């Protein structure tokens, strides 16, 4: 049976989490869905997988709530269920930055559609002639799997390090059009709002993140694959599972070449473990 995988998020003020949480868990469990839903005062972030009918039924139920009516999930297909259980969690933030909470009612940062971004990158500047800086907001191990050509990345181990990294390099972004990007949009949206708040004038978020860019325009101006947080580890620009795998022991990304090492034992170890590099994803 083919499994539909969806991911979606929205920054929206929620003050009824204690009611939403059991209702969502009951709905998902009744439909046989598995995955994780995060609820916080600043919004919702979800990753679900299951049969098409069950996914469509849940989304119809979710859309009946006016706060979530415009959520458009990103989809992919798999032969296997990537999640082991169904979790609905209440959190302080739907993506951890450890900064003052996003205020959804204040609005989101401007976004740039994948097709428009491709045009900017093709021509070497935005529509007003300013240079474009592609700013990768992801963790270092994700960037190592693939990123945009000439992208700026701050070698951060977790997203909560992003504000300090931006503060240290803020002057380098002056006078340029900054496009923040991430896997599916949630981190680059929060990052873009933060950059606006600290005085960076021309900031955009890549609408839908790297995966939406792959879906709409392919891999133009992108090098490598895109790390994803499930059993597939990485997707290529055709949104197909790629070669890199994640080590279950240390969570490092293992390239196809590294998988040939005698130190790579599925589920047990990899060259990173043996070499002492044990950085957990956060």
Swiss-Prot record:
Catalysis performed (reactions): uridine(34) in tRNA + AH2 + O2 = 5-hydroxyuridine(34) in tRNA + A + H2O
InterPro entries in alphabetical order: Rhodanese-like_dom, Rhodanese-like_dom_sf, TrhO, TRHO_N
Alphabetized UniProt keyword annotations: Oxidoreductase, tRNA processing
GO biological process annotation, one example: tRNA modification
Active site feature: 182
SMART domains recorded: RHOD
UniProt xrefs under Gene3D superfamilies: 3.30.70.100, Rhodanese-like domain
PROSITE patterns reported in the protein's UniProt record: RHODANESE_3 (PS50206)
Entry superkingdom: Bacteria
Record field: transmembrane: none
Stated family: Belongs to the TrhO family.
UniProt function note: Catalyzes oxygen-dependent 5-hydroxyuridine (ho5U) modification at position 34 in tRNAs.
Protein name: tRNA uridine(34) hydroxylase
Origin organism lineage: Bacteria, Pseudomonadati, Pseudomonadota, Betaproteobacteria, Burkholderiales
